[in-house]
């Protein structure tokens, strides 16, 4: 069996594809981490973010929303100098703002996991694509998720980023049919 065509020979990318991408994630804090990381890739490749993921975790308190939400402008100033992450002020500020929006949702009785999964009726959607060209970059579900996140104050959550998030967190499974990770193909 082969892997999806977007996977390079980089061992980090292979491990991500084989063990994380498309696997349903139901932990609210992990989903929070992923929506933040997906926003960091805007205009860049995912491998760039993936290679910096451990640095992001260190800089953003393992994506603990309470600790991230408490970060201030001096933290932003420090982080824009940190070569271990993408030094884009707006993206750094977005993570902090997204933590605050996440906490507001939780405080309002809207668990992030339930909110996110509601856009696929709490069931992973399996695409039956045989080639990468058949896989969309956005859908009506990612459009709706993007709109709803923005309404709640999230940033860097356009429809394409939301669709990448949905793929990464297993809301949709876009492994191509011939991929070793397509449902039913794993030993």
From Swiss-Prot:
Activity is controlled by product inhibition. It catalyses: Hydrolysis of alkylated DNA, releasing 3-methyladenine. One of its GO terms (biological process) is base-excision repair. Keywords: DNA damage, DNA repair, Hydrolase, Metal-binding, Zinc. The keyword Secreted does not apply. It holds the Pfam family Adenine_glyco. Hydrolysis of the deoxyribose N-glycosidic bond to excise 3-methyladenine from the damaged DNA polymer formed by alkylation lesions. This is DNA-3-methyladenine glycosylase 1. Signal peptide: none annotated. The gene is tag.
């Amino acid at each position: 069996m082969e892997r999806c065509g977007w996977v390079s020979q980089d061992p980090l990318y292979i491990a991500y594809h084989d063990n994380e991408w498309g696997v349903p994630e139901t932990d609210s804090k992990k989903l929070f981490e992923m929506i933040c990381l997906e926003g960091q890739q805007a205009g860049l490749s995912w491998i760039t973010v993936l290679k910096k993921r451990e640095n992001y975790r260190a800089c953003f308190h393992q994506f603990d929303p309470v600790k991230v939400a408490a970060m201030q402008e001096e933290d932003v100033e420090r982080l824009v100098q940190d070569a271990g992450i993408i030094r884009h002020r707006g993206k750094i500020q977005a993570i902090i703002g997204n933590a605050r929006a996440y906490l507001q949702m939780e405080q309002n009785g809207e668990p992030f996991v339930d909110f996110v999964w509601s856009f696929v009726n709490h069931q992973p959607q399996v695409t039956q694509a045989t080639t990468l060209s058949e896989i969309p970059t956005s859908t009506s579900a990612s459009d709706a998720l993007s709109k709803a996140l923005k309404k709640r104050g999230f940033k860097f959550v356009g429809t394409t980023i939301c669709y990448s998030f949905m793929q990464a967190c297993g809301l949709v499974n876009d492994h191509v049919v011939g991929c070793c990770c397509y449902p039913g193909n794993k030993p």
